[in-house]
Structures are given as C-alpha cells and as structure tokens.
C-alpha cells in the first residue's frame, strides 16, 4: 500500500464516520508565536480546543505537513543517520471538539489499523498514562487487548502537550512490533526500549486541560481528542520495511539523487547518509519556501538556511560541484504534488530560491576553506595539532561547515579537532537561541486581552460604512491591567462595544482620531485588533476623567483614513500591474499601508529595470484614470477562490470572507478600508524598488497629494541643478554631460601629470635605497594628499627597482598611511602582509594584504619615521 493510498484510505474512513476533511495549515503557525513551525496536526485547531474559535464541525481529520528543526522539537542532527528522524513529515490525525472522547477514539484507531489496514493484532501494543485506568479498561474490555500488552508510563511518555503552554492531557500510544531481528537482542527488550523493535505508530491525546505560563492546569471547556499518526511510519509497516527512507514516500527522491549523482544507494554508508539527508531536507526546503519562508539570518529563515546548507554540503560530498538541490524539487513534487497542489503552482519560484541560496553557499564554502587553511598553517607554526573548538564552531555557524567535513580536511594535515570544545560552543548557542526566541518580542496575545475576550467582551466594527459611532466603554486598560477610570495625562487602552476605528491588521495601520465622553476627551494614537472581534484603542486622556461604562462619541480622523484608503487600494492595483509586467509568479510577501505611503513586498528574482517600473506605474495610473468602482462583497471562502480572487498565500481565512474588487482588474480577499472609486487615488508614483531577501523585492510608492508633492520636489531639485550649472531653459542635461566630459578630460591630464611626477619621484627615492642581507630595501616618507596614490608610486618604484622591498608612507588628513610592496621574485621569502603587521602597531593601527602588496593606516602620524626606519630591521 503506497503512502498516497494510506492517506486516501484514512480520509475515507473518517469521512464515513462524520469527520470533515480539513486542509493542512501553513508551516508558519498562525497567531501562535510560541511555535517556530507547525509541528503537529492539532496546531491549527489550538483555538478550537481553547474555546476561542468555533468551527462548523465538531469532528475533523487532516494530513498535516509538519517541520521539526528548531526549538523544543529539533531532529536536524539525527536526520539521515537513523531510520525515522525527519525535518519534514506528514501527520495523519482525527480530532473531536467536545464530541466523542476516549471510548470512540480508541475504537476508531483500533478499527482502522486492524480492519482497514488489516494489521496483525498480535504485533500491536498500547501504552497509557500511569493513572489513566479508564483508557486501560477500554483497551482491555472494549477492544480485547490483553493486559500484558498494555503498558503504563509516566508524564514524560504519556502526557502530551504542544509546547510550554497550551492544550494538553493524557495520551495512549499504539506500537508496532518490527520483530526481534530489528531490536537490541536483550531478553528484557519491551515497549519503551530505545531500540528499533517497538515503533510508535499512533498517538491518541485526550485533551482535558490547558497549561498556562505558570504550569497550572485548568479544564478545557469540553474534553476533546487529538490524534497523530506519522504517514512515513505507518508506510513502513504497510510496505514491510524498517526504515522510513525505504518507503515509496522517500525512495522516489533517493532514486532521483542516484540518477543525478551517478552513485548507488546501499553501496557506501557515507553516501547513503548523504542521500537520506538530501531526500529528507529537500522535502522540508520545498515546503518551507512554498509556504512563504525564505532563507535569512534570523528566526524561521535561519533554520531554513541551516537545512539548505546541510543538504548542500551533503550534495558536495556526493560529488556535486554545482548547485544541485533545486533539481531535486521535481522529484519532491512528483511525489507530493497531488496532495499539495500549491507545490506545482510555485515550482519555478521554489527552484529559483533554492538555486540562489546554493550559489551563495558555494561562495561561502570557499571562503570558509580559506580561513581553515590559514588556521592550520598558524597552528603548525605553533607546533600544535588540534584545531580549537571555537574555530570549528565559527566554521560551522558562520560558514556552514559541518564538523565531519572540517575533520576530514584537517586529517590530511595530521590534525585532529577539539570535539568537546565544539560541543560546548554548540550548547552555548542552543541556550542563547532558546533565550532569544523567548524574548524576541513575539510573545502571545497579552493575557489581559484573553481575559477580556473570555468574559465575552466584543467590539462590533462599523467602520466600512461609518466614521463616527456612539458607543459605550466596556473596559479601560493601563499598563496591561484593567482599571475603573483614567485621568488626564494617562496613556490607556480603551475597549468599546461599537467602533468605527479600523484595528491594524493585514498590513494596514490602525485608525487614529478622538473619543469623547461627557467628562473626558481622548486622542486615539493607534488602534489594534488582538482578536478578530475585539478592537483596542490606544489613547491619551487629554482632559477630564474617563470611566468604564461611560457613553462615548467616537470619531475617526477622516483625512488620515482617506489617505490610508488611497494607499491600500493602490496596493491592490500595484499587485495586478506587477503580475502583468513581470508574470504570474509574483506573489505578495508582505505589505505596509499607512496614510503617508505604501510598501509592497513581492516574489521576484531580479531588480526591476527602469522600463519595467515605468510600465507598472503607467498601468496603475491608467487604472486610476479609468475610475472603476471599488466594491466589497462578502461570500463563502470557496466561492471567492473559485472566482479567482487573490488570497495571501498561507493566510488562514474563515468560512466567510470579504472580497474587494476594483472594476475588472483586481479582486482580492481583504479586510481593509478602501476608496469608493479608483479615481479617488488621484495619482500614483513609485519612489523606490529594492531587494530585501533572496527572491523578494520591495516597492515603495506614494499616492494623491503625497505623490504630487514628491514630483514637485523633484522639479525643484531639477531647477536648482539648472541654476548651479548655469543652464538655459531645458538644456541642463546637455550642460551636465559637457561638464562630466570635461571632468574626465581633466582627470586624464591629472593622471598623466601624476605619472610623470611619480617617475621623477622614483628616481630621487631610489637613490636612498639600502641593501640589507642582499636585499634592496627602500623605506621613505613622501608628501601626498591622497593615500591612494601610494599604490601607483609603489608600482613605479617596483618597475625601476626590479628586485627588492618598498616601504613608503605619507600623512593624510591627520592619519599615517603605510604601504609595503615586495617584488615577485622575493614574495616566497618575504610576505608584504607579514611586514605590514609588524609595522602597523608603531603608527597606532592595523593592516593586511597579499604577499606582494599590503597597506595599513594609523592614528599616530608622528611615529611614521620610526616605522619606516624599523622596516630595515624587520627585513634584515
């Protein structure tokens, strides 16, 4: 039975039993900053278990794409070396939200395994939480599992939680006996042994509690069920193999690697590890990029980069000299594209991101090798033969060098590596990374917001049609705590039952404005939305005393709202124009819409040309002049997708969505505020385009009066330039061209004069050359305003000296400058870099360079003569 068939059979089984098949969520957890990546099927249902979200169903099943490569769940270093560790895997799961509980969940699991998949009951074992007599009794009495095949374990093994906080509860696990030939051989080997004989295939978690940051357990509103069965593991059972890498899910990728590398799997263990690493990592890389993560030096992007570099290093070990990982995407998509069609839609984009990162790593690898070679040479001089752990860690962390690659390289030189020192550095990094993640500012929703929401406090938003509202203040917050009142001068957060203020979300800044009561006046400086139905107004009490329960008059700052709306609608038009000009691969990667400007990040692999930018700008302004109506419609999410509306990839939408349409040129899922007609935008002007990450570009633009002021400023600058160059009318450009041509002509004359001057200087300076130990040495101070001229002078002196060492210096802008040049015939004995390192401290500086040329600068010009004289002693 193939992996695809198992997945399909799982869905069919549970759908027939009243479960709704739910699509896998994005690998970036939505509204859950406690998680680095989605790592379990229940992640997308967390708020449902907590009672914060309601769905149209109480039974669900899914096949969730998961990544474990960072934080609490970090399997990266084991991947490729064991039969079961992965960075990417699929988790089959069935869920009950306050519907069925232990009795039904256990029955479903047992029936699916023993009747649908027809597994041998005698090879199945179960575990329960040590105190969960109920689950043990169900297994024994209801399903007929003998007591000797029911094991009890403590909290470490059979009490499940998603993270440090969140839903949790006792669990029961089902194990498959792979047979004595796969185990440790110990006569006491049983379920719970660390060997490969007994393999966990299904975990049923009985969600009864919520664990808070203090570790306290509180009952969930309704007991629920969360189960997880790894598709890779159950595939090994159904296909009669003992390694996940021998299943069809990964063998197709491994065979593709065989074809590209010319090597055979199962012929060399080192090659086998590399092939398994590439097979696993290619899946993780492909899915992570598809879900909107790009390689970077922080957060999720850094984890992706580490995975990519580890895979690229193993590709190099297999003999690939050029980028190869991007060529594995085809095999991944062949295997996974049916279940996850988004892979096929973004295939070219994914390949380009991988190829760009591979090229970057190949360059990094070469730089790392140069550093390692220098370190080995220095250690040899000191008579040492062990590369320090700090050096190994630097190569690993900064240049992506794995430890075994470093060990292989230095072994040829008779060196070993300090593995203990490296392990210590790694542990320090792990501890620091954990602290950085906890303190990154991405903590969960403030507890006070959760408390208010839990009490049923809500805010009805009327801002699409109204910019004023009469309401009642339901809560006042100050410094994270609820208060009864606030007085003038205090900054507070105000919650009302009805508001026209838009809370910041979807890249759009929140509204500003005023709130007035009978006894107070507040200036709203920002508006946020911690929950979809809870709006919080951050405001300064400017006069009087405001109290919870007061009636309030709310007024949005209309000019700010209007400017923001212009920029937001223009952002939609910009995306449409970009796709016309650059292609359908353009996807939104982020945005920021404020009253002042708009910023739009999108997927594209090269800087836009002036012509492309002009075309995009013209298309948007054509849309504006056409003045199409802007309409917003509410509809079912499925209907919106079928209509072709653009959605932000990876965003989680409810069953009902809002679609904003601009004539026939743009249709997007959007909850923001917009103008009524495209003509209200007035004028659109792009003011910047740049790259912000591999495969991501950013455009900044202005609209309306902001765009007009920008153009007027450019005109003012143009007129000022015309005045400066004394140009008449529209001839400024011609005048500047003539000035630049004259400048080049003068520069050539200066260079010719400088060459003659250097020739004259050279003759005079060479007269002062001394011979030291058979080597001609010229050390001299010269008068020179620009130290860049030292190199030209040195070249002239080398030509005349033919064989020797030149040390020249000058004082420029209050600083000392030194240059050392060694003729080629002597560079194997005397290195310019070594000489400059000895001289630089004398002038209060540092320097370096190549064997034949090196430079230094320092803050002690008064010591320049001393440094020049010291050159004779150093060389002698």
Swiss-Prot record:
Assigned keywords, A-Z: Aminoacyl-tRNA synthetase, ATP-binding, Cytoplasm, Ligase, Metal-binding, Nucleotide-binding, Protein biosynthesis, RNA-binding, tRNA-binding, Zinc
Protein name (database record): Alanine--tRNA ligase
Cited function: Catalyzes the attachment of alanine to tRNA(Ala) in a two-step reaction: alanine is first activated by ATP to form Ala-AMP and then transferred to the acceptor end of tRNA(Ala). Also edits incorrectly charged Ser-tRNA(Ala) and Gly-tRNA(Ala) via its editing domain.
The protein's required cofactors: Zn(2+)
Catalysed reaction equations from the record: tRNA(Ala) + L-alanine + ATP = L-alanyl-tRNA(Ala) + AMP + diphosphate
PROSITE patterns assigned to the protein according to its UniProt record, in alphabetical order: AA_TRNA_LIGASE_II_ALA
Listed Gene3D superfamilies: 2.40.30.130, 3.10.310.40, 3.30.54.20, 6.10.250.550, Bira Bifunctional Protein, Domain 2, Threonyl-trna Synthetase, Chain A, domain 2
Cofactor note: Binds 1 zinc ion per subunit.
GO aspect biological process, one term: alanyl-tRNA aminoacylation
Gene Ontology molecular-function annotations: alanine-tRNA ligase activity; aminoacyl-tRNA deacylase activity; ATP binding; tRNA binding; zinc ion binding
Enzyme Commission code(s) on record: 6.1.1.7
Enzyme superclass (EC): ligase
NCBIfam families noted in UniProt: alaS (TIGR00344)
Record's comment describing the protein's domains: Consists of three domains; the N-terminal catalytic domain, the editing domain and the C-terminal C-Ala domain. The editing domain removes incorrectly charged amino acids, while the C-Ala domain, along with tRNA(Ala), serves as a bridge to cooperatively bring together the editing and aminoacylation centers thus stimulating deacylation of misacylated tRNAs.
Organism of this sequence: Geotalea uraniireducens (strain Rf4)
PANTHER family in the record: ALANINE--TRNA LIGASE, CYTOPLASMIC, ALANYL-TRNA SYNTHETASE
